[in-house]
Design a protein with these regions (language model features):
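Conserved SAM/SAH-binding loop
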Residues: 3-6, 100, 140
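C-terminal glycine/acidic-rich active-site capping loop/insertion
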Residues: 71, 181-186
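Rossmann-like dinucleotide-binding domain that binds NAD(P)(H)
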Residues: 103-164, 170-175, 181
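A short helix->loop->beta-strand "cap" motif at the edges of active sites that frequently abuts
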Residues: 35-37, 62-64, 163
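Beta-loop-alpha module in the N-terminal Rossmann-like domain of NAD(P)-dependent dehydrogenases
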Residues: 1-58
């Protein structure tokens, strides 16, 4: 660890981990990549896809690793579900419903989608071994109506295989809930 990011840019450091407020991810990751460092960034990787694409381009150009902290993909339960899906035990997957809600910790610099949904999105893509081709989302802020950041978001994803996924994330639910339901033909 270091209080000064300059300490991390010298030649004795091969890689950096960025676990700072989201608004700083892009600047710090770009600086590290340009200094020829492999980078792991806590989720979400950046504030928007344009910034993420730029970081990915720099990493590819410099042959560096750029990783995001999607740690749930390595959870034994998620790995077990992946094996069950791949084995065909559930048959053809029709749809997936995912919920990640809790009360509190409203973020000041990102919306609930960027805070909570990256976990579920990475899990979905890992389980299905594909990325969505269509995404729609709607959200709102109820507590802090002056904020530009949603506190509740509903997303629908459609995959090329025809699988649908619904995702609900919220900072306002009175009971913490983490659930994923996978519906298949068996």
């Amino acid at each position: 660890t270091s209080q000064n990011s300059d300490d991390l840019m010298d030649g004795s450091v091969d890689a950096v981990v960025i676990a700072t407020p989201v608004r700083t991810h892009y600047k710090l990751a770009k600086r590290a990549l340009l200094a020829e460092k492999h980078v792991m960034v806590e989720k979400p990787i950046t504030m928007n896809s344009t910034q993420a694409s730029e970081l990915l381009s720099i990493a590819k150009e410099k042959n560096l690793k750029l990783m995001v902290g999607h740690t749930f993909e390595y959870n034994p339960a998620v790995e077990a579900v992946h094996k069950i899906i791949q084995s065909g035990e559930l048959g053809d997957i029709y749809y997936i419903n995912s919920t990640r809600v809790n009360l509190g910790l409203l973020q000041a610099d990102i919306n609930v989608m960027w805070d909570l949904a990256p976990h579920d999105l990475s899990i979905l893509c890992f389980l299905l071994e594909e990325n969505p081709e269509k995404v729609s989302a709607i959200g709102s802020n109820f507590v802090n109506r002056q904020s530009k950041y949603e506190e509740v978001v509903y997303m629908t994803l459609k995959f090329k295989s025809g699988i649908l996924a619904n995702l609900r994330v919220s900072w306002l639910d009175p009971v913490k809930q983490r659930s994923t339901t996978i519906v298949g033909s068996k």
